[in-house]
């Protein structure tokens, strides 16, 4: 082991700024106003951006594009981003966050998947025709009632799994580089690139990030920047674990927006606390399984009802629950499902 591997946080560019994100810190609320004036006036702050400063699409999402880049009307979970700051140091950026004033009108909270389906449950996304239901996945095979009639024994149980943190070793880190960046303007080079014989000059907006889906990152960043995908480059650095937790956008778009706004490289590194707060988790589930079997061990029928808690935004929920539903019988041949 040489210890020479470089992850996103190991890259340093001349003239680089450091970014932080102002989170909602309330689970469900309408935004009445956002005041960033004091943060903008703090010495060492180079940019403070809100939803009004996004030149392109103010939303991202791998499957459903429903997650705001920066919230301007409403927040739907405590980790929602409302404003981003780029400053000379991470400490100055953090101090600027404390100066951003947000006036919220807090709303009722829905905290689990079953409660979310109640007729009087608060709607997280008012524009969705099915309320809080993202997708209803149906699997049908054979005749379940005939299968249970042929069973000698029926087991009917409800199982629950909790929300699970992926807990990768490396917290999220993104570095945005503006198009036409020239490091010599700041009197230096990027050592990590020089070691590979690469120039630190960039002809398009570039994002360095440890990501599981870099091409999706490119397309979503381009949409937010209001440019074509071929005008954005994503460099997938080595990744200190992901396990599904680095599929969604976290700091990639924010770093790119700040880089273009300041015309300087911008690094956004999450603390462990922020990482735990922000990224999507493995779904909490409630699973009712009714299984029929004969005394000689043959499964005659399975009836499964699964509820998955996708949280505030779709992420990969419909894919995860499609997999869970189609695998509900496990590795067994069951004629009636």
Predicted regions and their residues:
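Structural alpha/beta core scaffold segments of enzyme domains
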Residues: 2-337
């Amino acid at each position: 082991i040489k210890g020479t591997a470089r992850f996103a946080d190991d890259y340093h560019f001349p003239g680089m700024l450091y970014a932080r994100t102002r989170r909602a810190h309330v689970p469900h609320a309408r935004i009445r106003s956002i005041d960033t004036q004091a943060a903008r006036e703090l010495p060492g702050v180079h940019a403070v951006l809100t939803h009004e400063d996004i030149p392109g699409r103010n939303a991202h999402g791998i499957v459903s594009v429903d997650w705001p880049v920066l919230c301007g009307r409403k927040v739907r979970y405590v980790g929602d981003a409302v404003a981003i700051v780029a400053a000379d140091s991470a400490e100055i950026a953090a101090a600027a966050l404390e100066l951003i004033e947000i006036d919220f009108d807090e709303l009722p909270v829905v905290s689990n998947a079953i409660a979310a389906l109640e007729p009087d449950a608060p709607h997280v996304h008012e524009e969705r025709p099915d309320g809080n239901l993202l997708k209803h996945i149906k699997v049908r095979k054979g005749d379940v009632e005939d299968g249970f009639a042929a069973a000698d024994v029926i087991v009917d149980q409800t199982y629950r799994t909790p929300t699970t943190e992926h807990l990768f070793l490396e917290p999220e880190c993104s570095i945005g580089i503006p198009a036409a960046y020239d490091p010599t303007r700041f009197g230096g080079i990027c050592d990590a690139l020089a070691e590979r014989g690469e120039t630190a000059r960039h002809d398009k907006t570039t994002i360095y990030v440890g990501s599981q889906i870099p091409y999706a990152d490119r397309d979503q960043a381009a949409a937010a920047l209001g440019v074509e995908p071929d005008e954005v480059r994503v460099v997938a650095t080595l990744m200190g674990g992901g396990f599904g937790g680095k599929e969604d956008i976290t700091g990639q778009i924010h770093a790119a927006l700040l880089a273009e706004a300041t015309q300087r490289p911008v690094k956004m590194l999450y603390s462990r606390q922020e990482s735990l707060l922000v990224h999507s988790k493995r779904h909490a589930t409630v699973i009712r399984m009714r299984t029929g079997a004969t005394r000689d061990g043959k499964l005659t029928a399975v009836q499964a009802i699964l509820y998955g808690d996708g949280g505030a935004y779709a992420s990969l929920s419909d894919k995860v629950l499609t997999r869970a539903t189609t695998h509900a019988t496990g590795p067994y041949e069951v004629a009636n499902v």
